[in-house]
UniProtKB/Swiss-Prot annotation:
PROSITE patterns: PAL_HISTIDASE. This is Histidine ammonia-lyase. The modification 2,3-didehydroalanine (Ser) is found at S145. Keywords: Cytoplasm, Histidine metabolism, Lyase. It comes from Legionella pneumophila subsp. pneumophila (strain Philadelphia 1 / ATCC 33152 / DSM 7513).
Length: 506
């Protein structure tokens, strides 16, 4: 078993989530949560013993909430909700996302507001620790009442139903339970609904996208700085005085990143007193653009950290007062809006990078050979690589359409306004692929542009990036098969090889 992480329910930070996933830590539930969990479960049992009618415990669900269920059918009711709601479609969610969903669901249930047994939570922990990941189709949730469909698929294996993935192989739930040291569970009152109600899928998809987007943000700062040097651009627009008087801290921070990266460039010094007085906006306004993006990403991070610890079940059990209350914490509007904001940020990262590629290949602006290759005409150079970047940028603009405004009523109009949080978060991963492609092309184009400035060199910091690119992709002295080069640089980007932290630590 791997190194352990003691989970204090409701106290996950973004940093701890990254650590748990990156280091593949095992989860151990803090013992001080046990009594809260037991008290919550006892509150549910008391409702049954006293023959009270409470939604989700002894009633139907959704628009069937007015149907009372007899006490001898309560276990069947909970099993039925899992089976009937497991109707997702589409590609399976990747293992890293499913691991995060499990972690968030464990964190949610173990806070003692859902009325489930400790045995159920321990079963989820066993799946997480043994890397037995339920097969969850990516489509089917509208983000209210929670992520019902995908969370039903998460829950199926606990009943011995469905399939799981272990070490990349899809196997039966029965085999998966054995690997985790488990047997099929018989759900008790409220437990099926507690497993299904919640926004852990939307939150996990959004968090996963945020973590990768942070890497893309840093890469874009680096690739944009390289483009400034390759295009003989000016570093004057990054002067701290300009940004201090506007006052936005994220913009001030972004400008500092550009100054640090470009410091010591021989190329910059060679044309410091030239006649060109202003650069195009995609070079000159990078701190303003990337500062706004950083601000949005910080907001998204703050929102998702709260949501990672939020109770999004319904109904909610308040054991101390003996109350079980129905509300609407399962509505994912805030996640949908956060995902929409992150989509805007990703679109702008890719869109501004595409514009810089266009500048670099234009000999009339950059002063470099047409399409960044000698003997242009015989060679097409970066002509069509830019077309690929433009295609990806255009895709992102369409994908950035806000999902939070796109509600459709469900469940016979009982659930008449939904958030679409899951689709809002899911599309971010397609945007990430597009954006990483654009940034890979910009890195290749900017490094190719540097070739024409030799023997002058870029800054020491940016030269490290140049050398990293050249370690897997050689200079373009003539046309060759281009696609593999883009994929090599995309891999480096997603492996976090072009990060500001990496440069700082070298």
């Amino acid at each position: 078993m791997s190194e352990q992480f003691i989970l204090q329910p409701g106290q996950l930070s973004l940093l701890s989530i990254k650590q748990i996933l990156d280091e593949e830590l095992s989860c151990v539930l803090a013992e001080n949560s046990f009594e809260l969990i037991r008290a919550s479960h006892q509150t549910v049992k008391k409702v049954i013993d006293e023959k009270k009618t409470v939604y989700g415990i002894n009633t139907g669900f959704g628009s069937l909430a007015n149907q009372t269920i007899s006490s001898d059918c309560l276990k069947e009711l909970q099993r039925n909700i899992v089976l009937s709601h497991a109707c997702g479609t589409g590609k399976l969610l990747p293992d890293d996302v499913v691991a995060l969903i499990l972690l968030l669901k464990i964190n949610n249930l173990s806070q003692g507001y859902s009325g489930v047994r400790l045995e159920l939570i321990n079963a989820l922990i066993a799946l997480f620790n043994h890397k037995v990941y339920p097969c969850i189709p990516s489509k089917g949730s509208v983000g209210a009442s929670g992520d019902l469909v995908p969370l039903a698929h998460l829950s199926l294996p606990l009943l011995g139903e469905g399939e799981v993935r272990h070490q990349g192989q899809v196997i039966s739930a029965e085999e998966g339970l054995k690997l985790a040291g488990l047997k099929p569970l018989e759900l008790e009152a409220k437990e099926g609904l507690a497993l299904l109600n919640g926004l852990q899928v939307s939150t996990a998809l959004a968090l996963s996208a945020l973590f990768i987007s942070e890497t893309l943000f840093e890469t874009a700062i680096i690739s944009g700085s390289l483009s400034v040097d390759a295009a003989s651009g000016s570093d004057v627009p990054f002067d701290d005085r300009i940004h201090q008087i506007r006052g936005h801290q994220a913009q001030i921070s972004a400008a500092s990143m550009y100054r640090n990266l470009l410091a010591g460039s021989q190329i910059r010094e060679s044309h410091r007193h030239c006649n060109r007085v202003q650069d195009p906006y995609s070079l000159r306004c990078q701190p303003q653009i990337m500062g706004a993006i950083l601000h949005q990403m910080q907001f998204v991070g703050q929102t998702l950290q709260v949501e990672a610890n939020a109770i999004s079940d319904n109904p909610l059990v308040f054991a101390e007062q003996g109350d079980i209350l129905s509300g609407g914490n399962f509505h994912g509007e805030i996640i949908a809006m956060a995902a929409d904001n992150l989509a805007l940020a990703l679109s702008e990262i890719g869109g501004s990078a595409e514009r810089r590629i266009a500048l670099l290949i234009d000999k009339n602006f950059s002063g470099l050979p047409a399409f960044l290759v000698r003997e242009s005409g015989l060679n097409s150079g970066f002509m069509i690589a830019h077309v690929t970047a433009a295609s990806c940028a255009s895709d992102n603009k369409a994908l950035a359409h806000p999902h939070s405004v796109d509600s459709l009523p469900t469940s016979a109009n009982q659930e008449d306004h939904v958030s679409m949080a899951t689709s809002a978060a899911r599309r971010l991963h397609e945007m990430i692929d597009n954006t990483s492609t654009i940034l890979a092309i910009e890195l290749l184009a900017a490094c190719q542009g540097l070739e024409f400035h030799k023997p002058l060199k870029t800054s020491p910091q940016l030269d490290k990036i140049y050398q990293s690119v050249r370690s897997v992709v050689k200079e373009y002295d003539k046309d060759r098969y281009f696609a593999p080069d883009i994929e090599k640089i995309k891999k480096k980007i997603l492996d976090k090889e072009f990060s500001l932290l990496t440069l700082t630590n070298e």
